[in-house]
Swiss-Prot record:
SUPFAM superfamilies: Putative dsDNA mimic. It comes from Klebsiella pneumoniae subsp. pneumoniae (strain ATCC 700721 / MGH 78578). Belongs to the putative dsDNA mimic protein family. It holds the Pfam family DUF440. It comes from the Bacteria. May act as a double-stranded DNA (dsDNA) mimic. Probably regulates the activity of a dsDNA-binding protein. Signal peptide: none annotated. This is Putative double-stranded DNA mimic protein KPN78578_21580.
């Protein structure tokens, strides 16, 4: 895969794209009770955090997860406003290179 460092999504664009994908697919992949909980609590305790891809993605995908081009976005709820997300609804692996639309999601079970 040939990728260009100058053609990447910004961190904000990456977070926004991951969250949009999450919202689009959540109804098909989460329990209805989880969707209700997320929607009720997101305003106060919800968030999306950007990370380098964790090593356990290698169990799910078969390409090099160079952190220059791939990001992991964790979407969920924290115990407090501004706290660390500890109630995870989805982990989204996203390619930040604009010409390579790769996305993989691990949903809450």
């Amino acid at each position: 895969m040939d990728m260009d460092l100058n053609n990447r999504l910004t961190e904000d664009e990456t977070l926004e794209q991951a969250y949009d994908i999450f919202l689009e697919l959540a109804a098909d992949n989460l329990d209805p009770a989880d969707i209700i909980l997320f929607n009720l609590q997101f305003e106060e305790r919800g968030g999306a955090e950007l990370f380098d891809p964790s090593a356990d993605w290698e169990e799910h995908v078969d390409y090099d997860l160079n952190p220059d081009f791939f990001a992991e976005v964790v979407i969920g709820l924290a115990d407090t406003d501004g706290g660390e997300i500890n109630d995870i609804f989805a982990r989204v692996l996203l390619c930040r290179e604009k010409d390579h639309k790769l996305c993989h999601i691990l949903w809450r079970e």
